Swiss-Prot record:
Lineage: Bacteria, Pseudomonadati, Pseudomonadota, Gammaproteobacteria, Pseudomonadales
PANTHER family per UniProt: 3-PHENYLPROPIONATE_CINNAMIC ACID DIOXYGENASE FERREDOXIN SUBUNIT, FERREDOXIN-RELATED
Cofactor note: Binds 1 [2Fe-2S] cluster per subunit.
Coiled coil location: none
Designated name of the protein: Naphthalene 1,2-dioxygenase system, ferredoxin component
Cofactor(s) demanded: [2Fe-2S] cluster
Species, as recorded: Pseudomonas aeruginosa
Gene: ndoA
GO function term, MF aspect, one: metal ion binding
Residue intervals of the Rieske domain: 6-101
Residue numbers binding [2Fe-2S] cluster: 45, 47, 64, 67
Kinase as UniProt keyword: no
Assembly, per entry: The naphthalene dioxygenase (NDO) multicomponent enzyme system is composed of an electron transfer component and a dioxygenase component (iron sulfur protein (ISP)). The electron transfer component is composed of a ferredoxin reductase (NdoR) and a ferredoxin (NdoA), and the dioxygenase component is formed of a heterohexamer (trimer of heterodimers) of three large alpha subunits (NdoB) and three small beta subunits (NdoC).
Any Pfam family hit: Rieske
Job of this protein: Component of the naphthalene dioxygenase (NDO) multicomponent enzyme system which catalyzes the incorporation of both atoms of molecular oxygen into naphthalene to form cis-(1R,2S)-dihydroxy-1,2-dihydronaphthalene. Functions as an intermediate electron transfer protein via a specific interaction with iron sulfur protein components (ISP) (NdoB and NdoC).
Length: 104
């Protein structure tokens, strides 16, 4: 599969240790800053229709604001009930001060 890097946001727009919701080419994503690294997942919880960008980020775990299920934002792994399905992650790279995401 060919990579297709898309300019999502400026790096400074993602608060340190927090999450930012963005729409990239019509797709809702959540971008996370964890210990100096940026990670990207789908913005909707796999359990309910809650936006992950409205959740609480602690370390590398995001807590869904609706039912308090948690995901590892680095791997997408579902960590506790009621979530059982992993959340999709996307490759991220930084070019200059821009956050680039591969949606392919």
């Amino acid at each position: 599969m060919t990579e297709k890097w898309i300019d999502a946001v400026a790096l400074y727009e993602i608060p340190e240790g927090d999450v930012l919701g963005v729409t990239v080419e019509g797709k809702e994503l959540a971008l996370y800053e964890v210990e100096g690294e940026i990670y990207a997942t789908d913005n909707l919880c796999t359990h309910g229709a809650a936006r992950m960008s409205d959740g609480f980020l602690e370390g590398r775990e995001i807590e869904c604001p609706l039912h308090q299920g948690r995901f590892d934002v680095c791997t997408g792994r579902a960590l506790c009930a009621p979530v059982t399905q992993n959340i999709k992650t996307y490759p991220v790279k930084i070019e200059g001060q821009r956050v680039m995401i591969d949606l392919s």
